[in-house]
């Protein structure tokens, strides 16, 4: 792609340091018109200042797109992923990963609407996000072109970025000196990387955590809540129906209050290196525990076991950027089929970093039958039936043993 061939670019724009510099750099290096796209996916910051910043950098008002995508994010991306109980490498709830396909989708759609040649993003050449953004974009438009400034320019340090900003009159509130953590926030989580976290043996500082109280300082009194599920999705809290993004917002509030959802892990990036990250996912941690609880009484055993076998593959696809892939959609179809009878309520107690399931019920799809599993006398289960069941399942061992084979 020749720079002279680029006439218009849609930039994923936050209004922060990196993307403001990218905006100016695109104007200078590519001599092109820039369209900015700012998504509100619940990052907890005002997005309107991005409009003022973009205008100050010469962007036409009609080329500024600021959209509230919180409901679409939770309804069409977070909830489908939580139906799968997706966890990457046993711990990570995929808060950053699941936000990228939605942003890629809107970048491509805005590019089509504005007749732009390219899309651009602020992901570095070391991380997973460049892969997620670009694979998503190519899946939705195979003819799209992508400009990834971090893979082109030489502004490869925070000090160089600040110097570039000062040289070009870009108003950046953060000053030289101690850099902030590299953070990503949305309605599902906040992630932290960099600084002391680059040493995996160095404990994170308490003042790093922005969202949740320390479990040590959480209230001495617990909260007990009831979450209602329909077809595998939460639809109400304490009998109050809510929209998807409202449910996650309320669970975040409750989880953060009780110090729930903090995580410190070393993960394997798709690009090949190991990375240490800290995460806060208060509402997601509650949702995962509650969802597994309602599945435990409504799902058939073999269907549940098969779903658990599929989950790591599903989680890897999301983590690596393959949300729009045919294989993820195939898995999603199977997962969604499994959720048709996942209906009912779960009661959880929230206390000092813990989510404890204390009750689960389903009026319509409960497979738990007390008459069969009671320790008291019953009239529906003949315990003698177990004789044949055990002998048939032991038959291969009996035959092999009689043939002299040792186990």
Curated annotation (Swiss-Prot):
Its name, as the record gives it, is Argininosuccinate synthase
Q: Does the keyword tRNA-binding apply?
A: no
Instruction: Give the binding site residues for L-aspartate.
Output: 124, 128-129
Q: Which family does it belong to?
A: Belongs to the argininosuccinate synthase family. Type 1 subfamily.
Catalytic reactions of this protein? L-citrulline + L-aspartate + ATP = 2-(N(omega)-L-arginino)succinate + AMP + diphosphate + H(+)
Its localization reads: Cytoplasm
Annotated ATP binding sites? 12-20, 39, 122
Q: Which organism is it from?
A: Campylobacter fetus subsp. fetus (strain 82-40)
Q: Can you tell me which residues bind L-citrulline?
A: 92, 97, 128, 132, 182, 191, 267, 279
The EC code for this enzyme is: 6.3.4.5
PANTHER family for the chain: ARGININOSUCCINATE SYNTHASE
Q: Name one GO cellular component term.
A: cytoplasm
Q: In which pathway does it act?
A: Amino-acid biosynthesis; L-arginine biosynthesis; L-arginine from L-ornithine and carbamoyl phosphate: step 2/3
Q: What keywords were assigned to this record?
A: Amino-acid biosynthesis, Arginine biosynthesis, ATP-binding, Cytoplasm, Ligase, Nucleotide-binding
Q: How does it assemble?
A: Homotetramer.
Q: Which terms in the Gene Ontology molecular function aspect does this entry carry? A: argininosuccinate synthase activity; ATP binding
